[in-house]
């Protein structure tokens, strides 16, 4: 039991270090000086996704943590012409998976459960649906650095300009929560 707890604690600490490695490459890929830097909100979105991805698998749960309605979040991404928040979340979960697979002592089942899948079979179905590969193939073909480069190449670089100007949390009068002033409708 003590060994199992030590492995879990090590994995949690490792995922924190992994988050730092992801952000160290992802944030500069969004753009830096002399180009306009990404909006603070865009940076915060990616920091939140990197932090929350191992435990969250739905946009609804992500939106709850970000204190934005899921439909509002998805609408903002669509209007900005960038991939959906689900795409960014699913990709980030795959990055964390690739990181865990670097540990030869972790089985596919271990990784599936640590990434909060209900079963190794569910995890395998997800990999096959998203990438068309088995968990074993994913482990061999997508080591962490390859997976991170692919994430940046597919989800950041083509949308760099839109992401720099993007404001995913820009709350309007409709989604500021229960403390917002009521909107009156003349009529």
Label the predicted regions.
Residues 56-88, 112-137:
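Basic/polar phosphate-binding segments, predominantly the helix-turn-helix DNA-binding elements
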Residues 20, 27-43, 53, 57-60, ...:
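Linker/hinge segments immediately adjacent to helix-turn-helix/homeobox DNA-binding domains
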Residues 38-46, 90-94:
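Short, leucine-enriched amphipathic alpha-helices that occur as contiguous helical runs
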Residues 121-131, 135-136, 152-187:
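Helix-turn-helix/homeodomain-like alpha-helical modules used for DNA recognition
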Residues 30-34, 44-58, 77, 81, ...:
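Basic, amphipathic alpha-helical hairpins
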Residues 79-118, 141-170:
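Terminal helix-turn-helix DNA-binding modules in bacterial transcription factors
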Residues 1-29, 37:
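Hydrophobic structural segments
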């Amino acid at each position: 039991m003590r060994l199992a707890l030590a492995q879990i604690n090590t994995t949690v600490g490792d995922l924190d270090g992994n988050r730092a490695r992801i952000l160290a490459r992802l944030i500069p890929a969004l753009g830096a000086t002399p180009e306009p830097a990404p909006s603070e909100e865009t940076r915060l979105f990616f920091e939140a996704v990197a932090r929350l991805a191992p435990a969250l698998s739905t946009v609804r749960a992500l939106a709850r943590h970000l204190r934005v309605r899921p439909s509002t979040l998805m609408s903002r991404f669509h209007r900005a012409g960038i991939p959906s928040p689900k795409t960014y979340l699913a990709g980030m979960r795959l990055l964390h998976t690739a990181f865990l697979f670097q540990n030869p002592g972790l089985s596919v089942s271990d990784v599936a459960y640590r990434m909060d899948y209900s079963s190794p079979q569910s995890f395998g179905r997800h990999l096959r649906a998203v990438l068309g590969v088995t968990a074993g193939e994913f482990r061999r073909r997508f080591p962490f650095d390859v997976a991170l480069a692919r994430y940046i190449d597919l989800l950041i670089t083509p949308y760099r300009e839109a992401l720099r100007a993007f404001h995913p949390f820009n709350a309007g009068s409709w989604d500021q929560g229960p403390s917002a002033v009521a909107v009156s409708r003349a009529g």
